[in-house]
């Protein structure tokens, strides 16, 4: 199709105030920074009118795309296939697993009729009975199951529900013999207990061994908690507390276990060891890979603020994760003196004596699970490709599983069980579940339990490869490239380039029927550079993209585009960059930083665009470990020059740009996208390409979105790319060029 016509200088107006913030700079003293759209940080009638006008304006442009209806229909069709996830045997001796028949708004929790392993290879893939259906909680699919935990006795099911994508969760409890389905009358739900635990955020649910109650993290009782149909809470997250809730009592009687009034922005996680003998308290000050770890003997008669904690690791310099324990001997995954991670033991009965069990290797130890009362299932990441191994508790390697698989692996298992499952996914692999059963003969222990079958999409028509390229400073960066086999690498193909690069998060090969369909329909190539700042190669790789080195992330991403064009994977003017959250920052910063004409289009999802104020909202203070603290004069000097909002060049042409946010995003609050959109439209009113913002309703940062919301958003987002670049819909019957 032809590019959608664009008339510059027609944006909805936004009032510019004379608001100025003063920051301290180590190099320049007081620095005055104008913030004319500071008023967009608050939910007022003026903000509502501006966002409504922007929604109408953007919708008008998107709806001019003649391909939009069939693109949405194609995305709906390609996602309409049964999706099952690895089953998990709980203490009621029944198997539980997530299942979605295809287009249900939220994935539901199913369970087996008895202790027999369910058959998930049946035609519909459900393999059992519906146990918990989040779709019964709302008419529009915006209530989501965020977390859950079964009691050790198997009688109770505690579950956290979030509404409209908020990070805030309310915990409820129901009897496991009373499933929640759409047939249950919500007003007369006899299976749900009176429990209603509010103000919960970033929390697990940790049942005590006696099944009389559970631990959780909450924030103070305030009126600013994000509500389902109201404005979001934007204040900074302060005063987290760990509580114990006893079943049958009101939340007001819950017992405070721990809080730190001197460090109001610290967060906590509490758990009980599998043997029921110890409490584990993790204390985090930010998003870095560092935490404190305290351990205490579990005493049901002494659950309160006077618990005597043994401060096993009490300095912030490394990450410590308990894998399992044998009495007082604890097995720990850590990056202490090991950027790629290793396994150590610490004996708390012997003065916290430490010994190395599994040394650091040249691959990143991304996860380790204790299984079968004496074994570990490890996932190593080597060049962004997962490898799964079985080790003994003595630290000896026994087997490698699925050696020919290229992609990402996730292990699901428990120490008390004689088998575990591995979920395998890749760019052209929609989902395979393997099972390792210790009780079988050694050569028969590994088998394929379930393979996902698609409807209307042949993954054999696509191929994925990995290349390496040099960044600006000479660092070698890996990049995956995916294409439909009919798409040629001759310098004419449009490319979607996706990135993240932050918080030690590895962006592994993943399956997306939506992306593959877009590649097929428009002859597009998908590229994923694994830039610095992520966790693909351990902690050193992460730190190479943090704080004063954050610019490395942007340089890596820009160099990826230049490599794609130079080597004819991409047409010079048709590379679209995309990323979400920290990846949204990546997109807006790179558009500012790259030479004019580097990108053909840019799409930034829920991005962190105001690096001078991110730390003042919700969980933002925790991100200072990656971004730096704008209130620190030394940090300000490396943050200010890269913050997208304050560094829009007014003398260069911007590519078509779409910012996406949501009205209930209380992780990266929407003010980031609001202010950047307003500033872009003011600073570049005559830009020959559109600079738009899409604002989702009753949605948050991403988690909990309904299937329908995801499909609609994908159609708008990728449709914007197609209409902005003038992409042509290909005949779907075209045969691959083998």
From Swiss-Prot:
Record-linked PROSITE patterns: PRO_ENDOPEP_SER
Q: Cross-referenced InterPro entries, in alphabetical order?
A: AB_hydrolase_fold, Pept_S9_AS, Pept_S9A_N, Peptidase_S9_cat, Peptidase_S9A, Prolyl_oligopep/macrocyclase
Q: Name the active site residues.
A: 581, 665, 701
Q: Does the keyword Protease apply?
A: yes
Kindly state which keywords UniProt assigns to this record, in alphabetical order: Hydrolase, Protease, Serine protease
Reported EC number(s) for this entry are 3.4.21.26
Gene Ontology biological-process entries: proteolysis
Q: Which GO terms describe its cellular component?
A: cytosol
Which Gene Ontology terms cover its molecular function? oligopeptidase activity; serine-type endopeptidase activity
User: According to its UniProt record, which reaction does this protein catalyse?
Assistant: Hydrolysis of Pro-|-Xaa >> Ala-|-Xaa in oligopeptides
Q: Whom does it interact with, and what assembly results?
A: Monomer.
Q: Which family does it belong to?
A: Belongs to the peptidase S9A family.
Question: What role is this protein assigned?
Answer: Housekeeping prolyl oligopeptidase (POP) that behaves like a conventional POP by cleaving peptide bonds on the C-terminal side of prolyl residues within peptides that are up to approximately 30 amino acids long.
- Official protein name in the record: Prolyl oligopeptidase A
Natural source organism: Galerina marginata (strain CBS 339.88)
């Amino acid at each position: 199709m032809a590019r959608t016509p664009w008339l510059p200088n027609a944006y909805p107006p936004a009032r510019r105030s004379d608001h100025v913030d003063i920051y301290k700079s180590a190099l320049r003293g007081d620095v005055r920074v104008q913030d004319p759209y500071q008023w967009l940080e608050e939910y007022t009638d003026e903000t509502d009118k501006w966002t409504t006008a922007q929604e109408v304006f953007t919708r008008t442009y998107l709806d001019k795309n003649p391909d939009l209806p069939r693109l949405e229909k194609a995305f709906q069709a390609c996602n309409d296939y049964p999706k099952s996830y690895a089953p998990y045997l709980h203490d009621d001796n029944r198997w539980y697993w997530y299942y979605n028949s295809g287009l249900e708004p939220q994935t539901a929790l199913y369970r087996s009729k008895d202790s027999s392993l369910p058959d998930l290879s049946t035609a519909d893939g459900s393999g059992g009975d519906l146990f918990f259906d989040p779709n019964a909680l709302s008419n529009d699919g915006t209530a989501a199951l965020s977390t859950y935990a079964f009691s050790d006795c198997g009688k109770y099911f505690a579950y956290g529900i979030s509404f409209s994508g908020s990070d805030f969760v309310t915990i409820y409890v129901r009897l496991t013999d009373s499933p929640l389905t759409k047939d249950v009358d919500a007003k007369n739900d006899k299976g749900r207990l009176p429990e209603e635990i509010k103000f919960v955020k970033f929390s697990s649910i940790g049942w005590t061994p006696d099944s009389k109650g559970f631990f959780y993290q909450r924030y103070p009782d305030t009126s600013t908690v994000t509500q389902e149909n109201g404005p979001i809470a934007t204040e900074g997250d302060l005063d987290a507390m760990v509580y114990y809730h006893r079943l049958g009592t009101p939340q007001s009687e819950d017992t405070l276990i721990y809080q730190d009034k001197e460090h109001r922005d610290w967060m906590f996680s509490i758990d009980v060891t599998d043997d029921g003998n110890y409490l584990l308290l993790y204390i985090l000050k930010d998003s870095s890979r560092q935490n404190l770890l305290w351990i205490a003997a579990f005493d049901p008669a002494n659950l309160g603020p006077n618990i005597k904690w043994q401060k096993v690791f009490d300095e912030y310099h490394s990450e410590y994760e308990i894998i399992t324990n044998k009495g007082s001997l604890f097995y720990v995954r850590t990056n202490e003196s090991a950027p790629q991670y290793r396994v150590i033991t610490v004996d708390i009965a012997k003065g916290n004596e430490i010994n190395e069990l599994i040394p650091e290797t040249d691959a990143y130890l991304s996860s380790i699970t204790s299984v079968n009362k004496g074994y570990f299932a490890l996932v190593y990441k080597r060049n962004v490709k997962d490898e799964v191994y079985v080790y003994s508790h003595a630290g000896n390697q026994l087997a490698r599983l699925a050696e020919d698989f290229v992609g990402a692996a996730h292990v699901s298992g428990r120490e008390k069980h004689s088998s575990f499952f591995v979920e395998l996914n890749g760019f052209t692999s929609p989902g395979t579940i393997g099972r390792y059963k210790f009780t079988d003969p050694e050569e028969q222990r590994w088998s394929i339990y379930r393979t996902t079958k698609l409807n209307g999409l042949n993954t054999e028509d696509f191929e994925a490869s990995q290349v390496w390229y040099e960044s600006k400073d000479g660092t070698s960066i890996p990049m995956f490239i995916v294409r439909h086999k009919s798409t040629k690498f001759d310098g004419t193909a449009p490319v979607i380039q996706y990135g993240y690069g932050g918080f030690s998060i590895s962006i592994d090969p993943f399956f997306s029927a939506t992306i593959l369909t877009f590649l097929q329909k428009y002859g597009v190539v998908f590229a994923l550079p694994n830039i610095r700042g992520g966790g693909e190669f351990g902690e050193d790789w992460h730190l190479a993209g943090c704080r004063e080195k954050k610019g490395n992330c942007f340089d890596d991403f820009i160099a990826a585009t230049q490599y794609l064009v130079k080597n004819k994977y991409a047409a010079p003017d048709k590379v679209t960059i995309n990323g979400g959250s920290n990846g949204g920052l990546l997109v807006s910063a790179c558009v500012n930083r790259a030479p004019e004409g580097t990108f053909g289009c840019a799409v930034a999802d829920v991005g962190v665009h105001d690096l001078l104020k991110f730390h003042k909202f919700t969980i933002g203070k925790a991100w200072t470990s990656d971004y730096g603290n704008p209130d620190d004069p030394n940090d300000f000097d490396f943050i200010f020059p890269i913050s997208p909002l304050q560094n829009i060049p007014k003398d260069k042409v911007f590519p078509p740009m779409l910012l996406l946010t949501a009205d209930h995003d209380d992780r990266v609050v929407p003010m980031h996208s609001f202010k950047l959109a307003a500033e872009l439209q003011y600073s570049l009113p005559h830009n020959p390409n559109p600079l738009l913002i899409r604002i989702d309703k009753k949605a948050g940062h991403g988690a909990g979105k309904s299937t329908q919301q995801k499909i609609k958003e994908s159609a708008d987002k990728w449709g914007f790319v197609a209409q902005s670049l003038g992409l042509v819909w290909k005949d779907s019957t075209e045969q691959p060029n083998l």
